[in-house]
């Protein structure tokens, strides 16, 4: 079962979907970031877009735009450490509340960054049926959407 699921991860048939709120407004309605990621040479706790790093691909689309913020859906083609956080910051739109790759100060009323896994889809190892799992946005995330919509 583990091998079967690992193979889906490797051949990009396992689908992982996230939602996030980024700072600023993305100009395009959708796009793909295909930029390699590796450890940041200046700070080993961080990851960064680095030539020669491991291939990392994030597909994104705008859900809604607000003054100074954008609600985004991301689909991972690869799965690198902090991939969405690194790629959104690379685009110049770090995730709201991300003090590692974005703002240096915490956002009042937010305990972490506005990034949430909303969906996972894979083929079941034994039954070969398509399994779709979803998880609603947490209250803290939806409260932040209400706050920025004012």
Specify the residue positions occupied by each region the protein language model found.
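RNA pseudouridine synthases
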Residues: 1-150
